[in-house]
Amino acid sequence: MKSFCVKAPAKINLFLHVVDKKETGYHLIEGLFVFANLSNFLEIKVGEKDSRYDNSTVEFINSESKINNQYNTVMKAVNLLLRHAPVRTKVTVKVVKNIPIAAGLGSGSSDAGAVVRTLGKLWEIDRTILNEIALNVGADVPASVDSKPVFVRGIGEELCHIKKFSLPTNVVLVKPKKRFLSTPEVFSKHEGKFSEPIKWSDDAEKDLLKFLKETRNDLQEIAISFVPEIKDVISTLKSQEGSILSRMSGSGVSCFGIFDSEENAKAAAVNIGKKQPEWWVCNTQLIV
């Protein structure tokens, strides 16, 4: 038996534009995805040769709400990967959840990305096949396989990795406790005008802050209509000393604030935690 202990970092959408909608119902997006030190931890065990693959299991620990052990992103990734395994085997995965679920931080997508990355390397599966598997599991999973800053297009399959990350890496994440949002439900309410596609270039990387201030999260107002408290979270982050950019991540409900220094980020997290005990607050660093 082989055993691996891996991290699945939280995903943050620094911006998210909805640019079109396919006949299949999928929305086409553009966004800048980054990943944080805040992580779930996965213990992946691969059984001996000729183990029964249908005995593969997933167990979740420390999740703030119950996750179906049979129908989830990790099990879906495992089942798809097993089709390309060089030997008949089984996989067991134990996931320690530190990233809130259904909160716009890619908790499930990052778990699946870590599984695709780990088993893909172990079984030497071609990267093209891995990308197809990742997209089959979920739109955010392809970006989560490498967990590096990336500009994303399409439904999540077009990736342009950031060569130079010109932003401070000090981040505070905030989420109202016991509030969750369904990504499909939030997207289904997007009925407004689509955003114009962005012409991404190396120039945008030179001053990411300037670039980001000209962007937004097209799902933010929709999410606020479901959870009005999101508006308070964003304004609270903006009001903290050293805050340079604050908005909602993904389809919500979590929000992020980027700060000019580690000291100001730590102070903001402490301050918000004291004033808003009903909010989950996390001071972390971006992975660049």
Curated annotation (Swiss-Prot):
Domain of life: Bacteria
InterPro entries for the chain: GHMP_kinase_C_dom (IPR013750), GHMP_kinase_C_sf (IPR036554), GHMP_kinase_N_dom (IPR006204), IspE (IPR004424), Ribosomal_Su5_D2-typ_SF (IPR020568), Ribsml_uS5_D2-typ_fold_subgr (IPR014721)
EC numbers for this chain: 2.7.1.148
Residues where ATP binds: P100, I101, A102, A103, G104, L105, G106, S107, G108, S109, S110
Molecular function (Gene Ontology), one example: 4-(cytidine 5'-diphospho)-2-C-methyl-D-erythritol kinase activity
Pathway: Isoprenoid biosynthesis; isopentenyl diphosphate biosynthesis via DXP pathway; isopentenyl diphosphate from 1-deoxy-D-xylulose 5-phosphate: step 3/6
Root EC class: transferase
Gene Ontology biological process terms from the UniProt entry: isopentenyl diphosphate biosynthetic process, methylerythritol 4-phosphate pathway; terpenoid biosynthetic process
Keywords: ATP-binding, Isoprene biosynthesis, Kinase, Nucleotide-binding, Transferase
Catalytic residues (positions): K11, D140
SUPFAM superfamilies: GHMP Kinase, C-terminal domain, Ribosomal protein S5 domain 2-like
Catalytic activity: 4-CDP-2-C-methyl-D-erythritol + ATP = 4-CDP-2-C-methyl-D-erythritol 2-phosphate + ADP + H(+)
Pfam family, one: GHMP_kinases_N
Protein family (similarity comment): Belongs to the GHMP kinase family. IspE subfamily.
Job description of the protein: Catalyzes the phosphorylation of the position 2 hydroxy group of 4-diphosphocytidyl-2C-methyl-D-erythritol.
Annotated protein name in UniProt: 4-diphosphocytidyl-2-C-methyl-D-erythritol kinase
Species annotation: Wolbachia pipientis wMel
Lineage: Bacteria, Pseudomonadati, Pseudomonadota, Alphaproteobacteria, Rickettsiales
